[in-house]
């Protein structure tokens, strides 16, 4: 029985206009979120770290998408919980406020390239402006033996004008190429974020539906965790793209948009 609904944001619920940093809801999203929220917990779990979690609420509300407090999750928030549990106190962070704020809120000191060590690890998130000196500083820390973490290594995500580059993945790839250090990833398709949601709601993944636009991210995460997976073709992938995924990681259902989600017979 489905007892909770987990939605991706970009390409599933809404599209971001990069120039303005605002969202526009996708077809059926507003009505679906409103109707489902009256029936069960609804959580938005994005792979993005453009903003701290708290900043997403008014942006999505402006697009007509209203989520309850504590029901928007980013991989930076997942990372913060996990790294505190590891006992980390100070991180070298290549990332903007979307990564820094959750870490600070969790009690971790955030250092940036140019700051003196020691650091416990290197953490990568989305950032708009970075250069060779930032990469060099992080590489030196990794050559010194520190572990590498990333919020997401997705190559791209859906935007209002087409695909947008996954900056954190690009930075991680550059550092891995230079240092041969493989990042530990907290975002989708890793299941740790979905397990955090399961713990928060006290609902196992087997009783959740996960809806997303990327077969390699939220759909793969859902299948690995045992959740029911629904793909929508409003973002990065076509129906053929969903169908071509290997069966163990393939969406159970693929829809053209969210407008027909509530009429499905598997609820």
Question: Which residues does each PLM region occupy?
Answer:
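Conserved phosphate-coupling serine/threonine residues in phosphotransfer and NTP-handling enzymes
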Residues: 46
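Asp-based, Mg2+/Mn2+-dependent phosphohydrolase catalytic module
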Residues: 1-9, 13-35, 54-73, 80-267
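Canonical radical SAM enzyme core domain
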Residues: 49-52
């Amino acid at each position: 029985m489905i007892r909770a609904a987990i939605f991706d944001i970009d390409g599933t619920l809404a599209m971001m206009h990069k120039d303005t940093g605002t969202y526009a809801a996708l077809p059926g999203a507003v009505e679906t979120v409103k109707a489902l929220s009256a029936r069960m917990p609804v959580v938005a779990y994005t792979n993005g770290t453009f903003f701290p979690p708290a900043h997403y609420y008014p942006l999505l509300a402006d697009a007509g998408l209203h989520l309850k407090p504590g029901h928007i999750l980013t991989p930076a928030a997942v990372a913060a919980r996990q790294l505190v549990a590891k006992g980390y106190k100070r991180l070298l962070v290549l990332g903007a406020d979307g990564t820094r704020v959750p870490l600070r809120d969790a009690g971790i000191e955030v250092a940036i390239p140019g700051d003196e060590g020691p650091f416990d690890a290197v953490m990568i998130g989305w950032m708009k402006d970075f250069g060779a000196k930032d990469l060099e500083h992080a590489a030196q820390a990794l050559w010194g033996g520190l572990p590498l973490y990333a919020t997401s290594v997705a190559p791209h995500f859906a935007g209002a004008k087409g695909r947008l580059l996954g900056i954190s993945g690009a930075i991680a790839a550059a550092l891995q190429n230079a240092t041969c250090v493989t990042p530990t990833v907290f975002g989708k398709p890793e299941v740790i974020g979905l397990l955090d949601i399961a713990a928060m709601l006290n609902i196992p993944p087997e009783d959740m539906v996960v809806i997303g636009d990327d077969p390699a991210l939220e759909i793969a995460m859902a299948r690995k965790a045992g959740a029911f997976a629904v793909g929508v073709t409003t973002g990065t992938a076509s129906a053929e793209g969903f169908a071509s995924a290997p069966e163990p990681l393939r969406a159970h259902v693929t829809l053209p948009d969210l407008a027909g989600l509530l009429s499905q017979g598997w609820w």
